[in-house]
C-alpha cells in the first residue's frame, strides 16, 4: 500500500497488517449476525463473543450489556491518564440479512477477493469498520499507547433491532457512554481514496396509509367510470406530494433549502444511484443533487398495494394501500414534518374516500459542527493518511438514531462520522464489498489521532 506520508507525518510507524485485516474480517463475516432472526441467534452470539475476545486482547476492560431488544452492546474501556479527554469509538457487529445467497457471486459468508475488492455480507457495513477500529488500536499499542481514555462501543442490533435497544441503554445508563469526543464508524467516503467526514444525517419516519371507497369489489363493466376506484384515489394522494419536476412538496414545510458543504457532482450522482441512460434526475437545473438528498425533506414511495397484475380482474378496487419513507434534514423536526404529511394525505383524499394513516419509526435528524478542535485534528489525520490536500465534508440521506441520542445526552461532545464504505460497496445489497485500502487508511487516521490529540 502507498501511505508513506501517513507513516512518517507523526514520527510513528503506522503500518496496517493487511494479512491480519483479511483474516480477521474473514472470521467475523463467517459468524453470520443478523439480529431479530431466531434461526441465526447462535451465530449472532458467536460474533459477539469474537468481538469481546478481540477487545480483551487489546487490554480493554470489556463488559457486555443486554439491551431490551435481546442483543448485547459490548463496551471496552481504557481509563484516561490524568485529565486527558475520553474518546468513544462506535461500530456495530450485526448485519442485514444476506437475502438469497444463490444470487451472490460467491458465498456471502466467505470473504472473497475479486478485482481488488473484498466481498461478503458486512464487509463495509459494518464489520469492516469493526476491523478498522481494531487495527487502529493495535497500531496505537505498537507505538507506545495513548494517554487518552477510550470507550469502544460495539452494538449488536443496529440494523434490525426495531426497539432502539442501544438508545434505551444510553438513556438508562448514560455514564457508560460519557465522552469528550464521539467517533461513529458507520459511514464512508464519497469515493475510494477521498477522505470524507459526514456532518448531517437526515431523520425520518414511515407513513402507511390505506384508502377505502367501496364495501367490496364491483364489476368494472357495470360500475367503472362512476364508482370511485381506491387505487385511483391513492395515486391522486401520492401525486400531491410531487411537483412537475419530481421534487417533494409538503404543504407547510420548506422544501427549497440549499446544501452549504461540498457539492455532489451530477454525473457522479447518476453513477452512484445507477440511473439509466436517458432518464433525468429529479428537479431543475437549479436543484443540485446535494440539495435534494442532504438539505431537503424527501418522500419515497416504498410500497403500493392494490391487486397484483398477475391477479388482475375486471373490477373496481375497493381498497388500496401505500407506504412512504420520509426523510427530514436538520434543523427540521421529523415528527413535525411527518404530522404535516399525515395532514396532507387526509386533506388530499378525493371524493370523500376513507383514509387511515399510521406513523412509525420516527427518528430525528442529526447535524454537527466540524470546526471543533478534535474534529479539525481528526480531519488533518485523515488528510495525512490519504495524502490528500482536501477534506470532503458531506451530508447523507441515511439515519443513525444513535447519533441523536448521544448528542442529547452529551451536547458538548464533538462528533465525527466516517468509515470504510464507498458508493461501490453496495451495502445491504447483493455482493456487498469493501476496498481494503479504505480500512487501512481510515485505521491509520484513527491511530494517528489517538496518538497525537492533545499533545
Swiss-Prot record:
Pfam families for the chain: M20_dimer, Peptidase_M20
SUPFAM superfamilies (alphabetical): Bacterial exopeptidase dimerisation domain (SSF55031), Zn-dependent exopeptidases (SSF53187)
PROSITE patterns attached to this UniProt entry: ARGE_DAPE_CPG2_1
Annotated residues for binding of Zn(2+) 1: 92, 125
UniProt catalytic activity: an S-substituted L-cysteinylglycine + H2O = an S-substituted L-cysteine + glycine; S-(1-hydroxy-3-methylhexan-3-yl)-L-cysteinylglycine + H2O = S-(1-hydroxy-3-methylhexan-3-yl)-L-cysteine + glycine; S-benzyl-L-cysteinylglycine + H2O = S-benzyl-L-cysteine + glycine
Cofactor(s) demanded: Zn(2+)
EC numbers, comma separated: 3.4.13.23
Keyword Glycoprotein recorded: no
One GO-annotated biological process of the protein: proteolysis
Enzyme class: hydrolase
Keyword tags: Aminopeptidase, Cobalt, Dipeptidase, Hydrolase, Metal-binding, Protease, Zinc
Binding site for Zn(2+) 2: 125, 159, 163, 428
A GO molecular function held by the record: dipeptidase activity
Catalytic residues in the record: 94, 158 (proton acceptor)
Function: Metallopeptidase that hydrolyzes the Cys-Gly bond of Cys-Gly-S-conjugates. Involved in the formation of the human body odorant 3-methyl-3-sulfanylhexan-1-ol (3M3SH) from odorless axilla secretions. Catalyzes the hydrolysis of the Cys-Gly bond of the Cys-Gly-S-conjugate of 3M3SH, a key precursor secreted by apocrine glands in human axilla skin. The Cys-S-conjugate obtained is then cleaved by the Cys-S-conjugate beta-lyase MetC, which finally releases 3M3SH.
PANTHER family: BETA-ALA-HIS DIPEPTIDASE (PTHR43270), SUCCINYL-DIAMINOPIMELATE DESUCCINYLASE (PTHR43270:SF12)
Similarity section: Belongs to the peptidase M20F family.
Name listed for the protein in its UniProt record: Cysteinylglycine-S-conjugate dipeptidase
Source organism of the structure: Corynebacterium striatum
Gene behind the chain: tpdA
Amino acid at each position: 500500500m502507498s501511505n508513506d506520508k501517513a507513516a512518517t507525518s507523526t514520527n510513528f510507524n503506522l503500518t496496517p497488517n493487511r494479512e491480519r485485516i483479511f483474516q480477521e474480517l474473514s472470521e467475523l463475516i463467517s459468524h453470520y449476525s443478523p439480529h431479530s432472526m431466531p434461526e441465526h441467534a447462535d451465530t449472532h452470539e458467536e460474533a459477539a463473543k469474537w468481538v469481546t475476545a478481540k477487545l480483551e486482547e487489546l487490554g480493554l476492560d470489556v463488559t457486555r450489556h443486554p439491551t431490551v431488544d435481546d442483543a448485547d452492546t459490548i463496551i471496552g474501556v481504557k481509563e484516561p491518564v490524568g485529565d486527558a479527554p475520553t474518546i468513544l469509538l462506535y461500530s456495530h457487529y450485526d448485519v442485514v440479512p444476506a437475502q438469497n445467497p444463490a444470487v451472490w457471486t460467491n458465498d456471502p459468508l466467505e470473504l472473497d477477493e475479486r478485482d481488488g475488492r473484498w466481498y461478503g455480507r458486512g464487509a463495509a457495513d459494518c464489520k469492516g469498520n469493526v476491523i478498522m477500529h481494531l487495527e487502529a488500536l493495535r497500531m496505537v499499542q505498537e507505538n507506545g499507547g495513548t494517554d487518552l481514555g477510550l470507550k469502544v462501543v460495539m452494538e449488536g442490533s443496529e440494523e434490525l433491532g426495531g426497539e432502539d435497544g442501544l438508545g434505551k441503554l444510553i438513556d438508562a445508563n448514560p455514564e457508560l457512554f460519557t465522552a469528550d469526543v464521539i467517533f461513529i464508524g458507520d459511514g464512508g467516503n464519497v469515493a475510494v481514496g477521498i477522505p470524507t467526514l459526514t456532518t448531517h444525517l437526515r431523520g425520518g419516519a414511515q407513513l402507511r396509509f390505506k384508502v377505502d371507497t367501496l364495501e367490496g369489489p364491483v364489476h368494472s363493466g357495470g360500475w367503472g367510470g362512476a364508482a370511485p376506484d381506491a387505487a385511483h384515489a391513492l395515486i391522486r394522494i401520492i401525486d400531491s406530494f410531487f411537483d412537475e419536476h419530481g421534487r417533494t412538496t409538503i404543504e407547510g414545510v420548506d422544501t427549497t433549502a440549499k446544501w452549504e458543504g461540498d457539492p455532489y457532482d451530477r454525473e457522479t450522482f447518476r453513477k452512484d444511484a445507477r440511473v439509466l441512460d436517458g432518464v433525468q434526475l429529479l428537479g431543475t437545473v437549479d436543484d443540485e443533487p446535494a440539495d435534494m438528498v442532504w438539505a431537503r425533506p424527501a418522500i419515497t414511495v416504498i410500497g403500493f398495494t392494490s391487486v397484483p397484475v398477475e391477479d388482475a380482474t375486471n373490477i373496481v378496487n375497493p381498497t388500496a394501500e401505500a407506504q412512504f419513507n420520509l426523510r427530514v434534514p436538520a434543523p427540521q423536526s421529523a415528527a413535525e414534518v411527518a404530522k404535516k404529511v399525515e395532514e396532507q394525505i387526509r386533506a388530499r383524499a378525493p371524493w370523500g374516500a376513507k383514509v387511515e394513516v399510521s406513523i412509525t419509526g420516527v427518528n430525528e435528524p442529526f447535524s454537527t459542527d466540524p470546526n471543533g478542535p478534535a474534529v479539525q485534528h481528526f480531519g488533518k489525520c485523515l488528510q495525512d493518511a490519504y495524502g490528500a490536500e482536501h477534506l470532503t465534508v458531506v451530508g447523507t440521506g441515511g439515519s443513525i438514531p444513535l447519533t441523536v441520542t448521544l448528542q442529547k445526552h452529551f451536547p458538548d461532545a464533538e462528533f465525527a462520522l466516517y468509515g470504510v464504505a464507498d458508493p461501490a460497496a453496495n451495502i445491504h445489497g447483493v455482493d456487498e464489498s469493501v476496498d481494503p485500502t479504505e480500512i487501512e487508511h481510515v485505521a491509520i487516521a484513527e491511530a494517528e489521532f489517538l496518538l497525537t490529540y492533545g499533545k
